């Protein structure tokens, strides 16, 4: 009798296989009381645990909250909506998602996941996962597991292989940032391009990673290694634009040429001088007077004046002309300062001597006779009487008139009469 009373006053404890005291609960499960007198059940791995109201095994954490072990033997607890979670280092709840990845809510209540690189990221409101970088900016992950950010203007952008941000604008076009932090887009044909400085010009990148621009007239042009812009015409032929916004193309011989206002091909020679090609595909350039300058097969300059007379240049850079009668017209280096803009001829049919054409009213020829007078030029009227140049001025030349009005003999006679008159007066 005394033994039975003693058993009623003290809870009945049964020893288990390991000689631990335990008592059966209402459903005849062995348990032992914890420090608070709550039932603690041993699990399969010989860990003490207790049962909650819905008969789930759990154990209390430091704050007395229930902590449940997960499948990977990690402690986790249940929140108010009965979702299993575990506290992180800061004591914030960390939930496993559907992919068994732990996540925790941030300050805004959004979920933050750790990625493979142990960086925290959280899902966006439209269920897109994003990260927070060192600057606190949102970093997203797309379907291809590529990183993309969201800047202050709510534009999505990615990080490419070179860790350069790639944006997507409102039209869902990919927007890159180049080395100079300029935006570069991807159009419908997946060709990357950017926006120029203030002119809203489209800048493309081709397969060779060269910039391809598109100006206001929708002509694409490139930037070569020397940062010179060259365009692509309708036939996908590259052509350049110089600093005067003139278009020029490289031809088959890799010579650069452009197209002027008349859609004529304008070439650039080795000296970066403009020369064009006329309707007969003959290259020519424009001189200071906008006169066409041609090149012959021997790379000699062939000019054409207003009267459509071809003008040549020999190897010594001496200009020589040819009129309709195929007579050559030279310009001598020694007398270029004297005879400016005055063509002079060699008449092979008569004298085989160079002669000039005066621009005065009379169009009178004047010669350079190298056999006489030490290469001093002399002029001739129809009677071919010479007039000599001295100190860049002819003796019979009047300043206010651009023609020769007196002959040399008459000039000497006048001086003689003047001297005789002075002697007579004295």
Curated annotation (Swiss-Prot):
Residues 17-114 are annotated as: Disordered. It comes from the Eukaryota. Keywords: Plastid. It is found in: Plastid. GO terms for cellular component: plastid. This is Uncharacterized 51.9 kDa protein in rps4-rps11 intergenic region. It comes from Euglena longa.
């Amino acid at each position: 009798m005394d033994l039975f009373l003693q058993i009623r006053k003290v809870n009945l404890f049964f020893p288990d296989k390991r000689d631990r005291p335990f008592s059966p609960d209402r459903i005849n499960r062995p348990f032992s009381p914890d420090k608070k007198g709550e039932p603690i059940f041993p699990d399969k791995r010989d860990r003490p645990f207790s049962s909650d109201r819905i008969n789930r095994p759990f154990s209390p954490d430091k704050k007395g909250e229930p902590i449940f072990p997960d499948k990977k033997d990690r402690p986790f607890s249940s929140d108010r909506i009965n979702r299993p979670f575990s506290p992180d280092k800061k004591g914030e709840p960390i939930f496993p998602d559907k992919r068994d990845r732990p996540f925790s809510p941030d300050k805004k209540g959004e979920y933050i996941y750790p990625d493979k690189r142990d960086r925290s990221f959280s899902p966006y409101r439209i269920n897109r996962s994003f990260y927070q970088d060192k600057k606190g900016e949102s970093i997203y992950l797309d379907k291809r597991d590529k990183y993309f950010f969201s800047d202050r203007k709510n534009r999505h952008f990615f990080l490419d292989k070179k860790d350069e941000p790639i944006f997507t604008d409102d039209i869902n076009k990919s927007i890159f940032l180049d080395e100079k932090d300029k935006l570069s887009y991807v159009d419908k044909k997946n060709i990357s391009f950017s926006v120029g400085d203030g002119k809203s010009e489209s800048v493309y990148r081709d397969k060779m990673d060269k910039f391809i621009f598109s100006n206001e007239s929708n002509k694409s042009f490139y930037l070569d290694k020397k940062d010179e812009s060259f365009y692509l015409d309708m036939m996908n032929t590259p052509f350049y634009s110089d600093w005067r916004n003139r278009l020029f193309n490289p031809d088959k011989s890799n010579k650069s040429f452009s197209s002027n206002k008349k859609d004529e091909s304008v070439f650039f020679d080795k000296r970066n001088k403009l020369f064009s090609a006329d309707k007969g595909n003959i290259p020519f350039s424009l001189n200071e007077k906008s006169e066409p300058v041609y090149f012959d097969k021997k790379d000699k300059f062939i000019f054409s004046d207003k009267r459509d007379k071809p003008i040549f240049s020999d190897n010594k850079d001496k200009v020589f002309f040819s009129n309709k009668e195929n007579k050559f017209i030279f310009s001598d280096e020694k007398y270029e300062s004297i005879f400016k803009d005055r063509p002079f001829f060699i008449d092979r049919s008569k004298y085989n001597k160079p002669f000039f054409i005066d621009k005065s009213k009379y169009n009178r020829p004047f010669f350079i006779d190298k056999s006489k007078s030490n290469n001093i030029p002399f002029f001739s009227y129809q009677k071919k009487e010479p007039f000599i140049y001295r100190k860049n001025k002819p003796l019979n030349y009047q300043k206010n008139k651009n023609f020769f009005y007196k002959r040399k003999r008459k000039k000497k006679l006048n001086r003689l009469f003047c001297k005789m008159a002075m002697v007579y007066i004295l």
